Amino acid sequence: MIEADRLISADIQQPEEEIIDRAIRPKLLAEYVGQPQVREQMEIFIQAAKLRHDALDHLLIFGPPGLGKTTLANIIANEMGVNLRTTSGPVLEKAGDLAAMLTNLEPHDVLFIDEIHRLSPVVEEILYPAMEDYQLDIMIGEGPAARSIKIDLPPFTLVGATTRAGSLTSPLRDRFGIVQRLEFYNVDDLQHIVARSASFMGLEITAEGARQIAMRSRGTPRITNRLLRRVRDFAQVKGNGEIDEDIASKALDMLNVDAAGFDYLDRKLLFAIIDKFMGGPVGLDNLAAAIGEERETIEDVLEPYLIQQGFIQRTPRGRVATNHAYRHFNRIMEAP
């Protein structure tokens, strides 16, 4: 099963979706919905850097996928009035790949590295002096004739994004002056995002219809916008084009997204714990084998929301389905 196949995947799926997402993506902090603590702190840090005519300190953003890490990087570049250069950890295979990007930066530019936890050790070593001293150490030649030269870099801001902050090496993590964690969004903020996106897309939507979509979006704006597009299709074919509570509810039910935002893969995971393993505890490897998924998919994609909403617990002995999960599926939790 590929994560991108899921309707409620937090990954970008189609080029059309990416184009729409870029169009409706907020450009400034004033337009940024949710994450009030992050927004307030970044506003202060950005203003202070601009007053000093300095580059913003290096920033690490972590949290589950789809919560706006790339959006925040774009906003920072816009607020600072500088260019944004974008790449990702897996793309930077050799030290020369990173060196080429660094030497093309203008003063105070933002370099955004997505999936920064996947940088190779060789590339990471190049990054240390670049972050600390704005210098690039390059080896010229090989063997006894090899020598190191230093290239000065303009002051820049590195923005690293990751879903797995614990996978970063300590030396890399310690070089970020600002660390921000993005949390799952509440329903009110997601409803605001639905209404804003619908306005950009020229859709008529009621407050109740927007809330129905928000409630089933797993706290994730990217999923919110994806569900909105699918509900739009349903409203245009089965209704008069307007999205009200009834249309939204029927569309999402047809798409097998339930009231908690679960799809078949979430239910498969929870039913495996409840039925196959008697509610748990069950080890991650056994659980992955039982549902035919990679353990990384469970850890990075499924579990964060289920744990945050109180449907499963991680224990030293494995994963356990909570009373909340049993109630959601109208099951009775047997006494141990």
From Swiss-Prot:
ATP binds at residues 24-25, 66, 69-71, 132-134, 175, 185, 222. It is found in: Cytoplasm. It catalyses: ATP + H2O = ADP + phosphate + H(+). It is an enzyme of class 3 (hydrolase). Residues 259-336 are annotated as: Head domain (RuvB-H). Keywords: ATP-binding, Cytoplasm, DNA damage, DNA recombination, DNA repair, DNA-binding, Hydrolase, Nucleotide-binding. Its EC number is 3.6.4.-. Mg(2+) binds at residue 70. One of its GO terms (molecular function) is four-way junction helicase activity. DNA binds at residues 295, 314, 319. It holds the Pfam family AAA_lid_4. GO terms for cellular component: cytoplasm; Holliday junction resolvase complex. Residues 186-256 are annotated as: Small ATPAse domain (RuvB-S). GO terms for biological process: DNA recombination; DNA repair. Residues 4-185 are annotated as: Large ATPase domain (RuvB-L). The RuvA-RuvB-RuvC complex processes Holliday junction (HJ) DNA during genetic recombination and DNA repair, while the RuvA-RuvB complex plays an important role in the rescue of blocked DNA replication forks via replication fork reversal (RFR). RuvA specifically binds to HJ cruciform DNA, conferring on it an open structure. The RuvB hexamer acts as an ATP-dependent pump, pulling dsDNA into and through the RuvAB complex. RuvB forms 2 homohexamers on either side of HJ DNA bound by 1 or 2 RuvA tetramers; 4 subunits per hexamer contact DNA at a time. Belongs to the RuvB family. Has 3 domains, the large (RuvB-L) and small ATPase (RuvB-S) domains and the C-terminal head (RuvB-H) domain. The head domain binds DNA, while the ATPase domains jointly bind ATP, ADP or are empty depending on the state of the subunit in the translocation cycle. During a single DNA translocation step the structure of each domain remains the same, but their relative positions change. Homohexamer. Forms an RuvA(8)-RuvB(12)-Holliday junction (HJ) complex. HJ DNA is sandwiched between 2 RuvA tetramers; dsDNA enters through RuvA and exits via RuvB. An RuvB hexamer assembles on each DNA strand where it exits the tetramer. Each RuvB hexamer is contacted by two RuvA subunits (via domain III) on 2 adjacent RuvB subunits; this complex drives branch migration. In the full resolvosome a probable DNA-RuvA(4)-RuvB(12)-RuvC(2) complex forms which resolves the HJ. This is Holliday junction branch migration complex subunit RuvB. It comes from Proteus mirabilis (strain HI4320). The gene is ruvB.
